[in-house]
Amino acid sequence: MHTNTGFPADFLWGGAAAANQFEGAYNVDGKGLSVQDVTPKGGFGHITDGPTPDNLKLEGIDFYHRYKDDVKLFAEMGFKVFRTSIAWSRIFPNGDETEPNEAGLQFYDDLFDELLAHNIEPLITLSHYETPLHLSKTYDGWVNRKMIDFYENYVRTVFNRYKGKVKYWLTFNEINSILHAPFMSGGISTSPDKLSQKDLYQAVHHELVASALATKIGHEIMPEAQIGCMVLAMPTYPLTSHPDDIIAVMEAERKNYFFSDVHVRGTYPGYMKRYFRENNIELDVTEEDLEILKNTVDFISFSYYMSTTETADESKRKAGAGNILGGVQNPYLEASEWGWQIDPQGLRVVLNEFWDRYQKPLFIVENGLGAIDQLEKDENGNYTVNDDYRINYLSAHLSQVKEAIKDGVDLMGYTSWGCIDLVSASTAEMKKRYDFIYVDRNNDGTGTLNRYKKKSFDWYKNVIATNGEDL
């Protein structure tokens, strides 16, 4: 009998980023505006009428002009894969055009060629919180069924353009986050306090249909390609062993499993039909929609930063006391500087839960520690960051990944989030830094944009070189 004792030989080690958080060049070479260009304080902050100087994402870290040097650094670490996104509004500036912007297409051609020249496979997210602003303002984003057609035109264009170059695709980043951040995730311009549950779940339905349609089209154009969904994953623990808390956990987890259930099984689960029925949510669902949904994904990818804890006792809930998406504080866990509770074992839990539920290959496409880094000189006079706290975080999580592989989980790869400093999604700041390469840019926008290797750079290089044996 074969036993899994460690990371497989073909394991895809790498790092991850998103176009809107690091490319910059927001109005260069014909690019249109996206929802990110009007959220200077992050996904949960206020929305401006247009781009404002305090929006760090407009310049990002200027990856658009510096990608060749950055890819060399990724290659030096030994990356097998690099996850990024295509900025939809680089390809279709408004989103509803029929003809694409050639300069935008050419940029990604050049980027993918550069990655492949360094033996790095591109892993590409089609929509990573980057809905063209015009589609948000004119159509109210994914609430409108027309979005499916616009997305179809976009994905057909990029699939045809990059077939043979990109074999790993994700349809939507953290697709379940639309329930918590409808503007950032779904381009929905209606304010959350006025957005009905019916319209919100109609937008969810449109995204699910579009995702399945992209999977169908992708397999037709690129039979060799692997197309996955991407969800925000957080295992949920009960605060107590009271049966009411156990039910609260079940209900909370279903809000997330719903998205992966549809992607993997190709149909709406019974518990969501009950939820719609009991909340008087009547969706516009056509027979054609139901047929399209049957186009299921090849693998499940997810982000993992934290677990969450649930209770049925409303008196135990305090505003801001839990993690990013609610819940209550877990008394057994420490938290990051941004209040995200750190739970390496939760990653093993979620890997096993996904595997037991679906028996589909899995891919960890985001994981990392957001922290304040201090640039200082080493003994040779070179600038670095002594980020042992980050090494400890990643080592603890990867140790649990190894345990999950021993449990029998089929895991394709791991891309740490923010392998180079970028503008954070939730708070739109530079000081919340993630992994291996420090970028000299400050929250006020000043800085040289010079790149410096952190201590974790060499640590991760060794992890990859030993295929996870040395953590």
Features from the language model and the residues they span:
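A short acidic, glycine/proline-enriched capping/turn motif at secondary-structure boundaries
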Residues: 80, 89-91, 129-131
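Active-site mouth loops of central-metabolism enzymes
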Residues: 52-66, 143-145
